Amino acid sequence: MSRVCQLTGTRANNGMAVSHSHIRTKKLQQANLQQRRLWWAEGNRWLKLRVSTRALKTIQKKGLGVYAKSLGIDLNKI
């Protein structure tokens, strides 16, 4: 399973690690992904999703159905 948020598509970011002597080396900044079982009220069922913590905060605020609809995602296909 790839490290990608199933709702937002958030993935790893390429960055640089800078030492005290300013030597720069490439590093990969992974997304903070969590495996969660979320209740989808409109579908009256549980969905097991791998989502970022930022997406989890938005789901708590708006609700899973509204948030997925705003992203253009059909939850019936998951």
Swiss-Prot record:
Single GO BP term = translation
Decide whether keyword Transcription is in the record.
Answer: no
* One Gene Ontology term, aspect cellular component: ribosome
Keywords assigned by UniProt, alphabetized = Ribonucleoprotein, Ribosomal protein
Q: Which InterPro entries match?
A: Ribosomal_bL28, Ribosomal_bL28/bL31-like_sf, Ribosomal_bL28_bact-type, Ribosomal_bL28_sf
A Pfam family annotated for this chain is: Ribosomal_L28
Q: What positions belong to coiled-coil segments?
A: none
Which molecular-function annotation in GO is an example for this chain? structural constituent of ribosome
Q: Which NCBIfam families match?
A: L28
The UniProt family comment states:
Belongs to the bacterial ribosomal protein bL28 family.
Q: Per its record, how is this protein called by name?
A: Large ribosomal subunit protein bL28
Q: Which organism is it from?
A: Prochlorococcus marinus (strain MIT 9313)
